[in-house]
Amino acid sequence: MGMLAPGPLQGRRPRKGHKGQEDAVAPGCKASGRGSRVTHLLGYPTQNVSRSLRRKYAPPPCGGPEDVALAPCTAAAACEAGPSPVYVKVKSAEPADCAEGPVQCKNGLLVSSPHCEEPCAHSCAHPGLPPHLVHKLPLSYLQTQDTDAASRRINAPLAAGWSWLRLWLVTLASGVDFPQVSAWMRALPSPDCPGLRTTGEQMQKLLLKENKVKTRKSKRRSGEGSHLTTSILEQ
């Protein structure tokens, strides 16, 4: 199992000739020349990552990025690098549960992953990640392990918000008599993970259930109407 990318940097040294500015030095790594010769950051070449991100996030260990397991939150920071599509290698912290795969980033957003069948439980490499980066992540990736209290605090409002929005959309679809939309919304646990949607067979079952409820309601209404007509005639 690969280890997680290191957290925020501890060792720092002032840059020569630039008062107040600092270069990041990974704990255990020697500062060698300008910028401590960091060639990769978050599994992506540093020339494609902005200087502010280079200072903000830790480089991989001295050995290089090969064995570094990158959590999706770390990949999101690399995605902030530029508008052109980039591919960041994301390795799971739990190889038995989650498959490896490239994550596509476009316009600074994490777009899609080919391995989206089950929500993966990741430990965020940087619990103090800025909220504007966290919000760019697909909700299916925002499920963190119990050990990561800081990430859970960030993710809880997002998960709650999606649950509320989905419930509201289901209610709205049912109210305006769109059973197909209602069933589809109920069958969609995650907005960003097509692999988590239900199969065609499950969808048909949901639609049949919706139609049965609709039929029951219409029968109830017609029954109430006929009873009312009978009582009026008797009078």
From Swiss-Prot:
Residues 1-36, 213-235 are annotated as: Disordered. GO terms for molecular function: RNA binding. It comes from the Eukaryota. InterPro entries: V-set/Ig_domain. This is Putative uncharacterized protein SNHG28. The lineage of its organism: Eukaryota, Metazoa, Chordata, Craniata, Vertebrata.
